[in-house]
């Protein structure tokens, strides 16, 4: 066989969600931007070193031609670079305050902060690049993330999370899981989830969106 991943029950997933919520609520536990950028850069360098291995794994687990798998590996590496550079573009805006006498002489501005725990559910057709698209931005902005890859192609996802940990990301900030259908739905609809990102069929995506807890934002692709 090509490999296997351990099944995850709700107890394990729920414990991670609890810790993710705690991290998000405790500002003193947040990683600094330069720390997150350094982790992503180290992970990108590891991916460059293992590019051929990652490409073979993509090809083997999904049946993709190797020439296309190499393109996917390169796109995933580039996606990491984009996340690092985008960190420098995250900024707030000034709010005009002199439009009323009450605001005259005052300053106000917005800042961007991590939204909170992210749950990602991904698809089979790009088992590494799609995971990078969903997970790396969350790590970049300081959101703990739990990701469920497609059941047919989980190996690249689990390896990417391992690479992030190898690069210095604490394990409590990112986790790959292969849950049952019941545990998957509990994970997605948990009220502690701040953002849900889904890549897959429209029917499944809209169905899951209808079950999200109040306040959970989502992106469907």
Please annotate each region the language model reported.
Residues 2-91:
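Glycine-rich loop-to-alpha-helix module at the N-terminal edge of alpha/beta enzyme cores
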Residues 92-221:
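Rossmann-like NAD(P) dinucleotide-binding subdomain of oxidoreductase/dehydrogenase enzymes
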């Amino acid at each position: 066989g090509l490999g296997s991943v351990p099944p995850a029950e709700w107890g394990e997933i729920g414990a991670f969600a609890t810790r993710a919520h705690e991290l998000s609520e405790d500002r003193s536990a947040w990683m600094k931007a330069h720390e997150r950028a350094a982790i992503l850069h180290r992970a990108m360098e590891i991916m460059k070193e293992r590019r051929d291995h990652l490409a073979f794994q993509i090809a083997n687990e999904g049946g993709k031609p190797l020439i296309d798998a190499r393109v996917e590996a390169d796109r995933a590496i580039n996606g990491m670079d984009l996340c690092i550079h985008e960190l420098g573009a995250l900024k707030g805006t000034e709010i005009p305050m002199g439009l009323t006498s009450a605001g005259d002489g005052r300053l106000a501005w917005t800042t961007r902060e991590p939204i909170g725990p992210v749950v990602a559910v991904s698809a089979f057709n790009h088992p590494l690049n799609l995971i990078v698209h969903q997970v790396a931005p969350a790590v970049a902005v300081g959101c703990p993330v739990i990701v469920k890859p497609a059941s047919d192609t989980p190996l690249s996802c689990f390896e990417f999370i391992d690479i992030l940990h190898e690069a210095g990301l604490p394990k409590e900030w990112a986790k790959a899981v292969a849950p049952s259908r019941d545990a998957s739905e509990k994970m997605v609809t948990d009220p502690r989830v701040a953002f849900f990102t889904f890549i897959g069929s429209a029917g499944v995506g809209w169905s899951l969106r209808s079950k999200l807890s109040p306040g959970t934002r989502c992106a469907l692709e």
